[in-house]
């Protein structure tokens, strides 16, 4: 058990107002010692990340099965409706950010849900300020924003953070245009791959990424273990 450590999640602990830790582990060989480690810790909640399904060992269902999709960027024509943006004048982007997090584990966990909307508002705000994103694209018809995507670069790849399309504009190609704009941006930045994460439960998002030639590259089981 000496190789299993609990890492304090500083931002999460500060934001939610109690101690939150994180464990990354793929196999638990000594379940008794693992439970001992949890019980003796000072954390009120521990997030457990694993490449394997630990449900039986933990006696707990995953709060999220996180899927990571990836693809190499391709060149597309530029779209007149796609704009770069750095402010949210009418709160449309904050609304879309909340929509992007509909299947988020922070929304699904009833003990965290009360701060879910604020969390995604902060995420959108810091993306517009370019603290959590290098670029924010919107799909706009006149003065109406129909969709948005945030993206940042890390090393030789781009990572999509938030993406959402207004309910009235779905199934009209808006999301694909946003993805294509990210691909064009990634090529300009000389980035080799694009990554995006979603939840297995969000089947519509999974189908959307697969339609846009993304391939599943990783699966992570996430558990929220609350101390009694």
Where are these regions (language model features)?
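A short beta-loop-alpha structural element at the N-terminal edge
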Residues: 81-104
């Amino acid at each position: 058990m000496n190789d299993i450590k609990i890492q304090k999640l500083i931002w999460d602990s500060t934001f939610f107002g109690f101690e939150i830790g994180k464990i990354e582990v793929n196999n638990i060989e000594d379940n008794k010692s693992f439970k001992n480690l949890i019980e003796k810790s000072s954390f009120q909640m521990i997030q457990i990340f694993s490449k394997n399904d630990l449900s039986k060992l933990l006696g707990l269902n995953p709060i999220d099965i996180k899927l990571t999709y990836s693809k190499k960027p391709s060149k597309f024509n530029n779209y007149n409706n796609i704009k770069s943006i750095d402010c949210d004048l009418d709160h449309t982007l904050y609304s879309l950010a909340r929509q992007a997090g509909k299947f988020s584990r922070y929304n699904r966990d009833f003990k965290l849900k009360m701060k879910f909307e604020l969390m995604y508002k902060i995420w959108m705000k810091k993306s517009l300020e370019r603290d959590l994103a290098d670029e924010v694209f919107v799909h706009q018809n006149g003065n109406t924003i129909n969709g948005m995507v945030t993206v940042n670069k890390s090393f030789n790849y781009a990572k999509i953070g938030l993406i959402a399309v207004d309910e009235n504009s779905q199934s009209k190609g808006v999301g694909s245009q946003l993805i294509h704009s990210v691909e064009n941006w990634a090529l300009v930045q000389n980035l080799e791959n694009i990554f995006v994460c979603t939840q297995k439960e969000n089947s519509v998002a999974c189908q959307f990424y697969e339609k846009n030639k993304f391939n599943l590259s990783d699966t992570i089981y996430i558990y929220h273990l609350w101390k009694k």
